[in-house]
Amino acid sequence: MPTVVVMDVSLSMTRPVSVEGSEEYQRKHLAAHGLTMLFEHMATNYKLEFTALVVFSSLWELMVPFTRDYNTLQEALSNMDDYDKTCLESALVGVCNIVQQEWGGAIPCQVVLVTDGCLGIGRGSLRHSLATQNQRSESNRFPLPFPFPSKLYVMCMANLEELQSTDSLECLERLIDLNNGEGQIFTIDGPLCLKNVQSMFGKLIDLAYTPFHAVLKCGHLTADVQVFPRPEPFVIDEEIDPIPKVINTDLEIVGFIDIADISSPPVLSRHLVLPIALNKEGDEVGAGITDDNEDENSANQIAGKIPNFCVLLHGSLKVEGMVALVQLGPEWHGMLYSQADSKKKSNLMMSLFEPGPEPLPWLGKMAQLGPISDAKENPYGEDDNKSPFPLQPKNKRSYAQNVTVWIKPSGLQTDVQKILRNARKLPEKTQTFYKELNRLRKAALAFGFLDLLKGVADMLERECTLLPDTAHPDAAFQLTHAAQQLKLASTEYAIYDHNITPLHTDFSGSSTERM
C-alpha cells in the first residue's frame, strides 16, 4: 500500500541535541537519519511501494510526489529548509488531498508522521484544532479520520518523559483515536541519539514494513515467494470475541478450476506473488536492489537460470485459462491467477476470499470440491460444452428475476425514456407502456424515490398536451390516467403490490383489435 511520509520542518525541530562527539545535531537531523534508514529498507525489501514526502510547518508542501525512486526521496531529505510554527492540521489536510488525488478513496495508505511532539501555539495548534473539532461545519471538518483506509504512525523525536511533561502525548493519542484507532505512536527510548532513533524506526519497520515471505506448495513442488503488499490480519465482525485471522506462511494449492467457473468473485485484497530465488547456501539471490548495477544484473542472471515453480505455475494458469485454489488457513481460501498488465507483461496474483467454509456460494463448500476423475461422468461434458457450476440452491433466490438497477444515472434515464417512447405510440403500445410504468413505480417505491413518480407524472401530462391533432383519442385518456395514478403512488398511502391498469374507454375496444 502507498506510504506518505510527513516531515515536521518547523523551528522546534532545529533544537540542538547533545550527542557524544564534536558534531552538533538537531532533532531534524535525527529525523532525517531515521527516515534514511526507512527508505533504505524499503528500497531493498519494498521496492514496489509508492512513497511520497510532505513537509509542513504552518503550511504544507509536497516535496516528492509518489515514486519508487528512493534516491530522490533521500536527496529531498538533505534539501529541506526550516520554517515557522507547527500546524499539524494543515499537514493532515495535505495528506488527504494528495492521496485522494493520486489513489482515490478506496486504496489503503500508510501515513508516517515525523515530529518532535510540539503541538504549535495559538490558533492552528493541535490543541486548538482538537478543542474546536465539534464546533465546525461539514465543509471545514477536521481531516481525521482520513477519507480512505489508513494507518497513522507518529514518530516522535522525543522520549516518553519529555512528552508526558506536557499534554503532547495525550493530544497525539487523540489523533490515533480519531483515525478509528488505526495506527501507533513511537517514542525514543532513553536519551536522544542516533542509536535510539534507529531502534525506534526499526520497530516501525518490524510492524509495518516487514516483507511477507511464504512457501508456495503444490504436491511435491515448492517455491519461496514474497507476497506484496503484506496481507493484513482479518477480523470477522460476526464473532463475539473476534480474533484476527492471519494467513499461513505455507500456501498450499488444493486444486485448479476454470476461470469461467470462478467468474469474478468478491475478495478481501489482491497481492503480487513474487518468486525468491535461493542459492545453494540458502541466501536470497535477485531479491531487492543493490547500489551496484553490475551486481544486480549478475544476481538476476543467476536467478533466471534456476528453475522455479512460480514460473511454471504462472505460465500454466495463463495458457490453460485456469486459477489455482490455495489454502490460506483453516477454512480460509484464496486463488492464484495470471493478470495481464499489458499485452506483453503479466503477473502472478493472489486474491483472498472471506474466511469461511463457503466463500463463493456458486461453488458450494470448498471441502466438498474434488477432482473430475472422482465423478461417474465428466461434469464438463465430452466436448467441454457444459459446467457443473453454478450450483443451484435449494431455496429460490431473491435475485433470480430481473430487477431494476439504477446504480448509474444512465440506467434511470433509459427506463424513463422507454416509458416516453411507448407513450408516444399509444394506443398500439398500451400493454408495453403499462408494463414499463408499473416496473418503474415499484422500483421507485422500493427505493423511496417518490420525487421520481411526481416527475414522470408531470412528463406524461406534458406529453398529453403535445399530442398532435391526428393522435388517437384514447392516447390522451391513457396518459392522463397514468399521470394521476403516479401522483397517487407518490403519497404515503401507496400500495407497493398495486398495479396500474389501462383505463377502459369507448376507444379501448378498437385499439385492442389493432394490437
From Swiss-Prot:
This is Integrator complex subunit 14. Belongs to the Integrator subunit 14 family. The modification N6-acetyllysine is found at K418. It comes from the Eukaryota. It holds the Pfam family IntS14_C. InterPro entries: INTS14, IntS14_b-barrel, IntS14_C, VWF_A, vWFA_dom_sf. Residues 2-204 form the VWFA domain. Transmembrane segments: none annotated. The keyword Magnesium applies. Keywords: Acetylation, Magnesium, Metal-binding, Nucleus. One of its GO terms (cellular component) is integrator complex. Mg(2+) binds at S10, S12, T86. GO terms for biological process: RNA polymerase II transcription initiation surveillance; snRNA processing. Component of the Integrator complex, composed of core subunits INTS1, INTS2, INTS3, INTS4, INTS5, INTS6, INTS7, INTS8, INTS9/RC74, INTS10, INTS11/CPSF3L, INTS12, INTS13, INTS14 and INTS15. The core complex associates with protein phosphatase 2A subunits PPP2CA and PPP2R1A, to form the Integrator-PP2A (INTAC) complex. INTS14 is part of the tail subcomplex, composed of INTS10, INTS13, INTS14 and INTS15. It comes from Mus musculus (Mouse). Component of the integrator complex, a multiprotein complex that terminates RNA polymerase II (Pol II) transcription in the promoter-proximal region of genes. It is found in: Nucleus.
